[in-house]
Amino acid sequence: MIREIFNSIMGEGKYIGRRFIFVRFAGCPLNCVYCDEESKGYFNRVEKIPGSGEFETLQKMEIEDIINAIDKLKTPDLFAVSFTGGEPLLYHKQIKEIAEILKDKGYRTFLESNGMFPERIFYFDIASIDIKLKEHFEYIKDEDYEKLYKNELKTIKKLYNLNSDIYAKVVIMEETNIEDVKIIAKDLSDIGNITLCIQPVTPHGNIKSPSQRKLFEIMEACGEYLKDNVMLTIQMHKYLGML
């Protein structure tokens, strides 16, 4: 279930630059072309000292062990505890129990999800939903993509109605169609006052990031519906060599 728990800087999205404890869960039903998480072969790693990047492997990782690990990694500047992945909502029952304990202890809770499981959503203080585009997959049927996209919007709407601080993120590639992102912006504006983070893909192999001009054009197109609720973020942690 748990791949690793560590303390680092949020490297992307609306809260980029804030200090977080990340609880990373293994497994995801999607297979995005730019993702390397599922290639990692380790489990139950816990950082020894906050920000050190040095880990120990635990024999077991029950809920009590997870809470203890979070408490040990807490720093005075901590902003929130992030449930990330993979896709954390594969383990929604366990996460709900962990989140309730953390709330009682005064932590903020943060969800990072692809939004494919709207029926598993419950309240988080903050949530980031990663909206997928067709080019994020080597191949996906039109009907499967439409189902995924509708579920992402349902998830966002549910979190918005729960009064979570919800924002959306979309990874932009060289081949991304501006009109596709503009549709996302319109659909978000129909839900409510939601920030959209435009994130150029981190290039590797055959995957290329978009031009500066395309990024400006996408932001302007989204601004027609979202006004100034559009922002550009990069994977800062990768540029800084952080976890």
Curated annotation (Swiss-Prot):
<feature type="domain" description="Radical SAM core">
    <location>
        <begin position="15"/>
        <end position="243"/>
    </location>
</feature>
<dbReference type="InterPro" id="IPR024924">
    <property type="entry name" value="7-CO-7-deazaguanine_synth-like"/>
</dbReference>
<feature type="binding site">
    <location>
        <position position="24"/>
    </location>
    <ligand>
        <name>substrate</name>
    </ligand>
</feature>
<keyword id="KW-0460">Magnesium</keyword>
<comment type="function">
    <text>Catalyzes the complex heterocyclic radical-mediated conversion of 6-carboxy-5,6,7,8-tetrahydropterin (CPH4) to 7-carboxy-7-deazaguanine (CDG), a step common to the biosynthetic pathways of all 7-deazapurine-containing compounds.</text>
</comment>
<dbReference type="Pfam" id="PF13353">
    <property type="entry name" value="Fer4_12"/>
</dbReference>
<dbReference type="GO" id="GO:0051539">
    <property type="term" value="F:4 iron, 4 sulfur cluster binding"/>
</dbReference>
<feature type="binding site">
    <location>
        <begin position="9"/>
        <end position="11"/>
    </location>
    <ligand>
        <name>substrate</name>
    </ligand>
</feature>
<comment type="subunit">
    <text>Homodimer.</text>
</comment>
<keyword id="KW-0479">Metal-binding</keyword>
<comment type="pathway">
    <text>Purine metabolism; 7-cyano-7-deazaguanine biosynthesis.</text>
</comment>
<feature type="binding site">
    <location>
        <position position="86"/>
    </location>
    <ligand>
        <name>S-adenosyl-L-methionine</name>
    </ligand>
</feature>
<dbReference type="GO" id="GO:0000287">
    <property type="term" value="F:magnesium ion binding"/>
</dbReference>
<feature type="binding site">
    <location>
        <position position="84"/>
    </location>
    <ligand>
        <name>substrate</name>
    </ligand>
</feature>
<feature type="binding site">
    <location>
        <position position="35"/>
    </location>
    <ligand>
        <name>[4Fe-4S] cluster</name>
    </ligand>
</feature>
<protein>
    <recommendedName>
        <fullName>7-carboxy-7-deazaguanine synthase</fullName>
        <ecNumber>4.3.99.3</ecNumber>
    </recommendedName>
</protein>
<keyword id="KW-0411">Iron-sulfur</keyword>
<feature type="binding site">
    <location>
        <position position="28"/>
    </location>
    <ligand>
        <name>[4Fe-4S] cluster</name>
    </ligand>
</feature>
<keyword id="KW-0949">S-adenosyl-L-methionine</keyword>
<feature type="binding site">
    <location>
        <position position="32"/>
    </location>
    <ligand>
        <name>[4Fe-4S] cluster</name>
    </ligand>
</feature>
<dbReference type="GO" id="GO:1904047">
    <property type="term" value="F:S-adenosyl-L-methionine binding"/>
</dbReference>
<dbReference type="InterPro" id="IPR007197">
    <property type="entry name" value="rSAM"/>
</dbReference>
<keyword id="KW-0408">Iron</keyword>
<keyword id="KW-0456">Lyase</keyword>
<dbReference type="GO" id="GO:0016840">
    <property type="term" value="F:carbon-nitrogen lyase activity"/>
</dbReference>
<dbReference type="Pfam" id="PF04055">
    <property type="entry name" value="Radical_SAM"/>
</dbReference>
<keyword id="KW-0004">4Fe-4S</keyword>
<comment type="similarity">
    <text>Belongs to the radical SAM superfamily. 7-carboxy-7-deazaguanine synthase family.</text>
</comment>
<dbReference type="InterPro" id="IPR013785">
    <property type="entry name" value="Aldolase_TIM"/>
</dbReference>
